[in-house]
Amino acid sequence: MYLINQNGWIEVICGSMFSGKSEELIRRVRRTQFAKQHAIVFKPCIDNRYSEEDVVSHNGLKVKAVPVSASKDIFEHITEELDVIAIDEVQFFDGDIVEVVQVLANRGYRVIVAGLDQDFRGLPFGQVPQLMAIAEHVTKLQAVCSVCGSPASRTQRLIDGEPAAFDDPIILVGASESYEPRCRHCHAVPANKDK
């Protein structure tokens, strides 16, 4: 990172599932604690895979988090002594998240968000592309393709071991039993078989 002499900026950590997004968010939050900075972490209520009140990485690292239902609920927890605001699984938040993040950065907070940049179909996911556009720093992580071992930038949704159809629901919170990382060439999204 570059030396920043002003307070308030946005960092986006994005990539496919199993690329280390939550792990990187946790690492950055822990570094702020060593620097005696005050941080708060948020997560959407919908993300309760491993814990209701922690952000937990797939490898078991965790940090306490405040679950919120709507983006603007974040404001209720912001205090002046905070330096850093971190938000995990940002793709699951409503459309107001972009404004919330902008307001917080403009008020002088370092805002770190992490989330999927593409849905299981390989299309831009939620508000993440907008957040990437307004961020000062974007870190795009890759996993390893579970089929061929190449760098994986996509998330494959599997239903009973088979790729999910294009028009299946976008949001379905799961872990390794329903998703795996894939490269561009091994990623498959068939048309709906019912049509």
UniProtKB/Swiss-Prot annotation:
Which reaction(s) are listed as its catalytic activity?
Answer: thymidine + ATP = dTMP + ADP + H(+)
Q: Which GO terms describe its cellular component?
A: cytosol
Single GO BP term? thymidine metabolic process
- Please tell me whether the keyword Isomerase is annotated for this protein: no
* Pfam families, sorted: TK (PF00265)
Task: Name the UniProt key words of this record, in alphabetical order.
Answer: ATP-binding, Cytoplasm, DNA synthesis, Kinase, Metal-binding, Nucleotide-binding, Transferase, Zinc
Tell me which InterPro entries the record gives. P-loop_NTPase, Thymidine_kinase, Thymidine_kinase_CS
Name listed for the protein in its UniProt record: Thymidine kinase
Source species: Bacillus cereus (strain ATCC 14579 / DSM 31 / CCUG 7414 / JCM 2152 / NBRC 15305 / NCIMB 9373 / NCTC 2599 / NRRL B-3711)
Q: Which gene encodes it?
A: tdk
